[in-house]
């Protein structure tokens, strides 16, 4: 969040499983990839992305290796009981202190063990301020009615959350996704960075609290679960700031951005002809997102007018522009574009996708920009990432010129094979 010096234009706070990530109807993650391109193209430079998930950090990191998730500015895990910031996931110790008030995990564990209706979930889901169980839906009311006064009598304040049809979480009273969001908004306001608009996105019961925070827009994706829809019907059906999207998962989030007029909602992935693609704002980050989408389509054999495209690309490269391969080898940018010709369609019919992450542009001197990003490439189940730095120059009224591109293997990538990495 420190990279922003003014209030974010938009802060998206989204659940992951079956909200940002579609595990059942989108095996190629196309809706997620569309959102990714939109975010990096139009929002990353002046907005905040927050993931708020029921997963513990261990399981969140596992999901990142399985799905093309962007890197969030803030990650809220374990149903709003843990908050961390940035790439390094620096924990918020102040939030821990807040949750410690009137909380004793040992007492909660002791009292819940007396209920045979509660079956502990796996060890990864048990956290310092959260105990997670499975329970039959029909038993929830009876268990909470009896468990609540027992814990209260022992001086422990808790919150019960039922979601997913059978998941039952016992949290520290101050926890939960809604309280974590309220805390984050208060923190940003104190820093003079209260978002101009905030959009909360969810699909299940543990997302309910997100939609109760004042001055926050909300979207329930089309595949929202029964317990969330019941809450909406009883509590928020007349609230114009909360909608039930007609699109699933990430598609519903993109739909909500347009519905509430929070900013652009046309993903670069939905633009068929990049030669006609004009960004709303002049931003060299747009050029990078557009190029790597072109690269994906080129290798999938999905580009028409190939000569026109390559000529346009070469014209946007400085005559003496250089590309530094992750192996350390250097060659002309224009020669690199020429070499793309022999790779046209080599990934046709294969599961091949490319996406960009953390695209951030800095104007170093008038007319000169440095863009840094992570460029991911996936073929089948194999994925690789290079941290990429691009130098652009521009003149008023003219487009951006590619001056220099350098790539090094990212620490996140497990496969570092120079031989089949092109750019």
Curated annotation (Swiss-Prot):
Give the keywords, sorted.
Answer: Hydrolase, Magnesium
The biological pathway it contributes to is:
Glycan biosynthesis; sucrose biosynthesis; sucrose from D-fructose 6-phosphate and UDP-alpha-D-glucose: step 2/2
Q: Does the keyword Hydrolase apply?
A: yes
One GO cellular component term, please give it. plant-type vacuole
Q: What class of enzyme is it?
A: hydrolase
Q: Per its UniProt record, what InterPro entries does this chain match?
A: HAD-like_sf (IPR036412), HAD-SF_hydro_IIB (IPR006379), HAD_sf (IPR023214), NTF2-like_dom_sf (IPR032710), SPP-like_dom (IPR006380), SPP_C (IPR013679), Sucrose_Phosphatase (IPR051518), Sucrose_phosphatase_pln/cyn (IPR012847)
In terms of SUPFAM superfamilies, this protein maps to:
HAD-like (SSF56784), NTF2-like (SSF54427)
Identification of the protein by name: Probable sucrose-phosphatase 1
Species in which this protein is naturally found? Arabidopsis thaliana (Mouse-ear cress)
What's the gene? SPP1
